[in-house]
Each structure stands twice: as structure tokens, then as C-alpha cells.
């Protein structure tokens, strides 16, 4: 079931690229560590994910520049997280600071029980454009259910992201 959900999510993400014009799709691929601050040491594992952003939906507001973000990841313990939310963009010289917030669906698989299927991801990403339309970033995120579930252990994750605007 978890694998089917991930395949569906990836298919939808790649479908955006098939129908978009040149420069309409920003795809990110990332890998890193799930539950990086695991006190017990039994839930830490690897993660791999994909994220989609549409530059055409980019909005410049009084609070900054924002665009929608949709993505998902799977961990080495078969946990799956699918999310959609909003990402801000702030420039600091050649660096981009990209905070984001995204509610999503979490399935624990054989991994960490986060207490609910509804989980919220807050993330801070620092990126640097390495080639034209390509960015390399470091991200740190926290996922928790805001005490809406039976338990709320939360998880902190870190990963490296490669983004390409097609």
C-alpha cells in the first residue's frame, strides 16, 4: 500500500513536467537522514524524496515571495510521507533561504510511529545556485502532529537536495 501511494505521487509529479512549458516545473530530489536526533537510536534511518514546485504560481507578497510545494519521501524503514504546502524564498547574496510549511499524510510502515496520519512539516532550506536553473541545498525539517494524535514524538530530519528548473 505504501509503495503504491509513492508510485502514484511520483507519477502525478512527473505528469506536471509532461504538460508544462519550458521553465514551468521545478523538481527537487533529496536524500538524507530521518530522525537525526533519535535519543533511543532505533528509529534513525535514511530517506529519499522528490518535491515539485511550479514557478508560475510564485507570488511576491508583503511578507516575502511564496509558492506552493508538493512532495513526498520514503524512509529505509518503509515509512512514507506525502505533503503539500507553501515555501517562502528570501535572498541573502548568492544564498537562498527557503522556509516552508506543509501538512501531509504519514504512514509509519516499519518505522517510527509519529502518533497520527496527519503530520505537519516545517523546514528551513539553504540553497546555492550551482548551474543555470540548478540548485544544491541543505535542509533541516521537523515533522510532528501538534499534539493532535495519541502521541507526538516528532522527528527531525536533514537532507541534501538537488533542484532543477525544467
Residue map of PLM features:
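Transmembrane beta-strand segments that form the barrel wall of outer-membrane beta-barrel proteins
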Residues: 26-35, 63-75, 98-107, 139-144
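Residue-level signature of outer-membrane beta-barrel architecture
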Residues: 52-56, 88-90, 128, 142, ...
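Outer-membrane beta-barrel initiation region
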Residues: 21-55
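Short loop/turn motifs that connect adjacent beta-strands in outer-membrane beta-barrel proteins
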Residues: 19-24, 55-66, 91-97, 133
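Membrane-embedded beta-strands that build the outer-membrane beta-barrel scaffold
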Residues: 50, 86, 97, 124-126, ...
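Cleavable N-terminal export/targeting peptides
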Residues: 1-22
Amino acid at each position: 500500500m505504501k509503495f503504491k501511494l509513492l508510485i502514484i505521487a511520483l507519477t502525478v509529479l512527473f505528469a506536471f513536467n509532461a504538460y508544462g512549458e519550458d521553465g514551468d516545473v521545478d523538481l527537487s530530489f533529496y536524500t538524507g537522514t530521518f530522525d537525526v536526533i533519535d535519543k533511543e537510536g532505533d528509529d534513525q534511518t535514511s530517506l529519499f524524496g522528490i518535491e515539485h514546485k511550479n514557478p508560475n504560481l510564485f507570488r511576491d507578497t508583503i511578507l516575502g515571495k511564496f509558492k506552493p510545494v508538493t512532495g513526498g519521501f520514503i524512509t529505509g524503514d518503509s515509512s512514507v510521507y506525502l505533503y503539500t504546502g507553501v515555501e517562502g524564498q528570501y535572498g541573502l547574496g548568492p544564498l537562498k533561504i527557503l522556509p516552508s510549511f506543509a501538512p501531509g499524510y504519514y504512514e509509519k510502515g516499519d518505522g517510527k510511529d509519529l502518533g497520527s496520519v496527519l503530520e505537519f512539516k516545517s523546514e528551513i532550506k539553504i540553497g546555492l545556485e550551482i548551474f543555470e536553473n540548478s540548485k544544491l541545498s541543505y535542509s533541516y525539517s521537523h515533522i510532528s502532529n501538534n499534539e493532535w494524535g495519541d502521541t507526538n514524538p516528532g522527528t527531525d530530519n536533514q537532507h541534501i537536495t538537488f533542484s532543477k528548473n525544467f
